[in-house]
């Protein structure tokens, strides 16, 4: 039976993550001059600090000899595959590189608190196509990166969770009124992220669409704004974050797939998976 050292109430921790991220979304939506969706507002900083201070910490008995958890704790830092350029999800403050804010970023910090009793995270930014390799070669311990659980990926790595559900959606330039969703992408040039579910999902919905893939989300957004594609298909959460940060973009229609987010970890590491799933239950 899993347990945690602290007896404080935990159920509101994940809710606090959502609330802090929503605060950032509100600030981002009302101030287009801001490059960073979180971390600069004093109230938000205070909320993040309170959230981390109230987070659960794992019992010593869970760190069994030879386990991944023990190795991480002995090392003294959690190595996380995590973006630095995803608004509202995981974005680095350009004026303070140590400040990374957003939903995935806060969850990674909470997991490190569960392991160490305080946030100790070292971020390794992945591209979409390198996430599995980073886990397979031990460069990172976990991946928090809007990481959709798929059968193909689950053959290469393991997933804890899911901890959130989203879906693929369509983004276009703000002045584009011709495309209103996936049904309008037949015969269009569609931008997708390399090694993302959109690579397979778009042809299934629109076989005549021409795909152009990019390694990172910022590259894909830039390509759309430069007119190198008619639309960008990506996870709705990421697209909505981009649109909130950039008034030249908009999301059209509704998500047309269901995409559960998981936490990536090494293939077959059942003990570590159970450890993380227990932590997810504690913060819900």
What are these regions (language model features)?
Residues 164-172, 236, 240-281:
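Periplasmic-binding protein-like
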Residues 22-27:
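C-terminal motif of bacterial Sec signal peptides marking the signal peptidase cleavage site
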Residues 130, 147-155, 201-203, 225-258:
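A ligand-binding cleft/hinge motif common to bilobed small-molecule-binding domains
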Residues 38-47, 51-143:
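Extracytoplasmic small-molecule ligand-binding "clamshell" domains
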Residues 78-82, 98-101, 182-195:
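Short loop->beta-strand "edge-of-pocket" segments that line small-molecule binding or catalytic clefts
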Residues 120-184:
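Acidic, polar ligand-binding/catalytic clefts
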Residues 121-133, 177-178, 212-222, 226, ...:
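Short helix-initiation/N-cap motifs at beta->coil->alpha
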Residues 29, 40-63, 105, 176, ...:
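Extended ligand-binding regions for polar small-molecule ligands
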């Amino acid at each position: 039976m899993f347990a945690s050292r602290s007896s404080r109430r935990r159920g509101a921790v994940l809710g606090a993550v959502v609330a802090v991220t929503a605060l950032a979304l509100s600030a981002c939506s009302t101030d287009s001059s801001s490059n960073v969706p979180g971390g600069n507002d004093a109230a938000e900083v205070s909320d993040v600090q309170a959230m981390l201070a109230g987070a659960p910490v794992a019992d010593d008995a869970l760190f069994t000899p030879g386990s991944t958890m023990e190795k991480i704790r002995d090392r003294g830092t959690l190595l996380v595959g995590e973006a630095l350029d995803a608004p509202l999800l995981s974005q680095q403050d350009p004026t303070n590189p140590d400040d990374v804010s957003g939903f995935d970023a806060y969850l990674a910090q909470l997991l490190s608190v569960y392991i160490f009793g305080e946030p100790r995270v070292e971020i390794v930014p992945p591209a979409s196509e390198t996430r599995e390799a980073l886990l397979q070669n031990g460069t990172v311990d976990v991946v928090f990166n809007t990481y959709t659980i798929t059968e193909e990926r689950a053959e290469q790595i393991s997933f804890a969770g899911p901890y959130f559900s989203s879906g693929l959606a369509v983004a276009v330039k703000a002045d584009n009124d011709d495309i209103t969703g996936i049904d309008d992408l037949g015969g269009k040039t569609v931008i997708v992220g390399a090694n993302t579910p959109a690579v397979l999902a778009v042809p299934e919905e629109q076989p005549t669409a021409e795909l152009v893939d990019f390694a990172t989300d910022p590259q894909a957004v830039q390509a759309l704004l430069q007119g190198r594609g008619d639309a960008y298909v990506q996870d709705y959460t990421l697209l909505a974050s981009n649109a909130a940060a950039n008034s030249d973009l908009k999301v059209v229609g509704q998500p047309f797939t269901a995409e559960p987010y998981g936490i990536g970890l090494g293939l077959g590491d059942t003990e570590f998976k159970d450890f993380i799933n227990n932590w997810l239950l504690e913060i819900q």
